[in-house]
Amino acid sequence: PAVVRWAIKGVTDPKVYVIDDQTPYGTGLRDAANDYITAQKVNKVGSDSVAQKTADYSATVAKIKASGANIVIYTGYYPDGGALAKALSDGSWKGQFIGGDGVLNSAYIDVAGKAAAEGTKFTAPAVPFEVVANAAQQAAFTKATKLKSAAGHVYVTETFNATNVFLSCIAKGNTTRDKIQSCVSAGTFLTIDGKTKISFTFAGEVKGGAPVGGFQVVNGEIKYFGAV
């Protein structure tokens, strides 16, 4: 649902075209997007299913342009998403291109090219590390990774939180798989900010669902716009 909400935000008379990459991830996100589109009566003008590593997107671009779509939701991964975005730009299509967390990668801009990537939107159940980490945490990240910033790296915050959840359970003497699973599903844990609490189902899902963030390429960089 979030990918559709973020896609149509700010677009007058949205006309949506949905494309998947035929992978389990891509078809799953496609189905979720289509369900929301149907439920909210969003105007969907077309869809396509294009295999990964497609060399020529000209036929797909032609279909999109013929449909009158002003939004393309791509549910695959960034190498193909970037190639499709470039093909759309080269084909003079004007509209909003958006992908999920499979497309949210700084390398997407390199694949698509800065001009084609500009304005692209993304969604992911993630909050950028540089947004929530304090100075000490960011310094520790730089020391451990040799990276000046976590910007452009998805799920750093979530990895930080997950690691500390496991360490917390281990510190309590839970050192087997079964005991750690029971600890995780029964406990309540603080996240990176030291204030927000999370808990998990036995299957490891965040209770209540993880907030989904909206991102967009602005001036050649991926920016975070909060929960969508």
Name each region found by the language model.
Residues 1-228:
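Extracytosolic ligand-binding ectodomains
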